Amino acid sequence: MSINEETSRLYQREPSVALPQPFAGLLNLALILVISEGVWYGLFSPAGPVTLYTPNVGLSLVITILMVIHWGVDVFDFWPFSRDFIMKTNRFLKGFILLSLSIGIAVLVMFGFYYNVIGRFGPIFFSGPQLIVSGGLGQYSQTAIENGCYAQIMMNTCVIFFTIMWVRSFGFSPWQLSNRLTKSLSVWLLGIFLGIIAFSVLFYPHIAYQFYPPQIFMAVPPWWSEWAMTQSGLFHFGWIVSALVLLYWTKMLWEGKPFSLIKTEWLSGTVMMVSVIVAGVIIMLIGNRIMDWYFGSEAFIGGNTTEQPAWRWNHVAEMALFMQAAAVVLYYYFDNWPVKGSLPVRALVRTVIAMAGGLLIAKLYYLLGPVFLGTVKGIGQENDTSNCWTVMFLILVTAHAVFFDGFPFKKKNVL
């Protein structure tokens, strides 16, 4: 995750710890891996004390935290904190305050807003506890909570995608001349509005039809089921996450190119929006073909786990997030290497590193996950997804780099 150039210039810090690369990057990566292991065991691991990885409860929580961090950094530009606070406050204290605030707001959104406002007085499917209270057929504790968190995951993913897509494509237009809070609130509300529309079309039909009996007067049958070979909204999750990763990469790895070559802002933004959506769908379809080759069979209705269409679409998202994990490590911890040479060459090398690094992270996750994370052995298991760990890792890296300024090994703030 990165932020707009204005914020980057505003909050750049002077060098503080002069460790040369790649030592600073390797030390920070080692530090964050140790922290991620501790956080995972303490909050998510089936062998730990809290066991949030059900998996949807844990995944819903980390996606909500990621959404709030995006709001605070990309949309609100650290409001209500001042420039002096960001620049002059002790790095550890500043990071603790910003991360704690982000987590606190996320918990309020998930357990306060979704569980006890929306789920209690509106669409009940956002709240597992309210589904249990309803006494509906099949809504026992585990199923109800997983269903409620699934709805939150998909809604929050839509909000993240359309918020970042607008910021990357159009900045704060058409409110760029307004004051800081006005333009931030406008983009924030627009991202939520577009996310609700997308959720209603792409995910709500699946949610309405996952209950028994199907809620035929509340939603149309999943309109994508014939050619997606599944009623699951994971079909859309696959291409949205892939497109979201491309949005990240346009800023992080490609430095705004090629879309910034179009000088007319509205045209550049429109081309970017259309391009990443189309590319996301193409990546998902290509990823499915690669899995046909890797697993030795095509997906089909009624297949085993790795042959289920819904699992395949979700696995595309999982692989995209593994590659995003490699990209943020390169961007934040290794100064977005390489930084010399022509931009096309730099962008190509960074992209190859992110893709290869993502494949390596995926291999290590499935190989070492059962030992260090308590996950189930094998690449395809029911009720298991790597997305929870990957999003948690993205949060930790981003918070460490942006909130804590890479403390203690990074030599400068990398906002």
Where are these regions (language model features)?
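Transmembrane alpha-helical segments of multi-pass membrane proteins
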Residues: 17-30, 88-108, 180-197, 264-282, ...
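Long, acidic/polar, low-complexity amphipathic helices and coiled-coil-like
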Residues: 101, 108-125, 131-237
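Cytoplasmic membrane-interface regions of multi-pass membrane proteins
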Residues: 2-17, 69-95, 159-186, 208-214, ...
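Membrane-helix interface motif
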Residues: 34-49, 108-132, 197-220, 282-300, ...
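N-terminal signal-anchor module of multipass membrane proteins
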Residues: 1-72, 156, 391-397
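C-terminal transmembrane-bundle signature of multipass membrane proteins
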Residues: 30, 34-41, 235-253, 276-291, ...
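Membrane-proximal helix-loop-helix units in multi-pass membrane proteins
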Residues: 111-155, 283-332, 339
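Alpha-helical transmembrane segments of polytopic membrane proteins
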Residues: 25, 52-69, 96-97, 138-159, ...
